[in-house]
Amino acid sequence: MHKMAQEVEDAVGIRLIHIADSTAPSIKDAGCKAPLLLATGYTMEQDFYKGHLRERHGIEARIPDADDRAEIHRIIYEELCRGEIWADSKETFLEVVRKETAKGADGVIFGCTEIGLLVKAEDFEVPSFDTTILHAQAALDYALES
């Protein structure tokens, strides 16, 4: 849906809370400028999330290298979406974040609802941003303001 966010909002005539818009304030509050985006391959590789962060918020989200993207995508679809939580998969996520923070990533975005099943904020030395929680909070805030 977020890939077509503006079109959806225009068609239905009500405000759509873009997931990147609900995540950006927390990224900025943490002082991050180049967080690592972990998500499905589509979300990491296409520009609807990264581009939105860059164009609307000045945040340059990074993504892992191609092999790591493929493994993260596989873990999400073949394990997490099936309710399978494996220690070696958690270690893969942690290692990807370690590699990318060594290259300059200053935070980590959980860009898929299932990632929070595998890793938690306390697993990382950099700030993390669980988009599921942040998006839900933005929707609640909007509902309470209306």
Q: Which residues are covered by each model-predicted region?
A:
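Non-catalytic structural scaffold of enzyme domains
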Residues: M1-S146
